[in-house]
């Protein structure tokens, strides 16, 4: 994923890719190249617009490691894709090509490899020629923003935090990364 600044310039305390959990008033465009699994897909889901290269793969493979996509991926993917498609991605952890992501509406454009930054900047130029206050207001209304918070996301974050606690304390959460590091298939215990 190509990110000019990987943090909000006015909120360095949010850390790398911190805008997944915070509302940004200006339009955000993800320029994605290569593999965007886990956090890369979660950044794309948190962005207003997404431009991806032909070779790009999207996915939330956390379940393959005994984890869940805790940076908004689980509750956002069902808003971006048809429910059955989203559930397949969540349950299998398998990746989706940029062509399929475009077909299902997860992204806005697929561009030739090596051109994603230029394409994202061209899209930004089409936005910046419009009245900023109207663009920002349109974003707030479309996202259901009240007092700088996307109100629908609050419930999703609450559920995610509640579930991640139990998952992270599980034996499976230890086994998944261990098996990955040892280059073997995990032995799940459901505990």
Residue ranges, per PLM feature:
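Helix-loop "lid/cap" segments that line or gate small-molecule binding pockets
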Residues: 89, 141, 145, 162-168
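An acidic, glycine-rich surface segment that forms the CoA-thioester-binding/catalytic face
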Residues: 4-33, 65, 154, 158, ...
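Interdomain hinge/lid region at the active-site interface
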Residues: 169-173, 179
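Beta-strand-loop-alpha-helix segment that lines the small-molecule cofactor/substrate pocket
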Residues: 1-2, 48
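Terminal low-complexity tails and localization/encapsulation signals of metabolic enzymes
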Residues: 178-191
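C-terminal long alpha-helix characteristic of the crotonase
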Residues: 51-56, 98, 107-158, 171, ...
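CoA-thioester-processing core
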Residues: 15-25, 31, 37-91, 104, ...
């Amino acid at each position: 994923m190509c990110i000019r600044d990987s943090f909000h310039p006015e909120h360095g305390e949010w850390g790398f890719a911190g805008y997944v959990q915070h509302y940004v008033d200006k339009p955000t465009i993800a320029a994605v190249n290569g593999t965007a699994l886990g956090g890369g897909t979660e950044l794309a889901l948190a962005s207003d617009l997404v431009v991806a290269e032909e070779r790009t793969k999207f996915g939330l493979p956390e379940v393959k490691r005994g984890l869940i996509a805790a940076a908004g991926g689980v509750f956002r993917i069902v808003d971006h894709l048809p429910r059955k498609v989203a559930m397949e991605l969540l349950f299998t952890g398998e990746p989706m090509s940029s062509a399929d992501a475009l077909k299902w509406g997860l992204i806005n454009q697929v561009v030739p490899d090596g051109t994603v930054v230029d394409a994202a900047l061209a899209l930004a130029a089409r936005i910046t020629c419009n009245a900023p206050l109207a663009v920002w207001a349109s974003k707030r209304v479309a996202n259901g923003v009240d007092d700088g918070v996307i109100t629908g996301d609050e419930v999703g974050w609450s559920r995610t935090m509640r579930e991640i606690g139990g998952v992270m304390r599980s034996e499976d959460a230890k086994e998944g990364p261990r098996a990955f590091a040892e280059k073997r298939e995990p032995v799940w215990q459901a505990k």
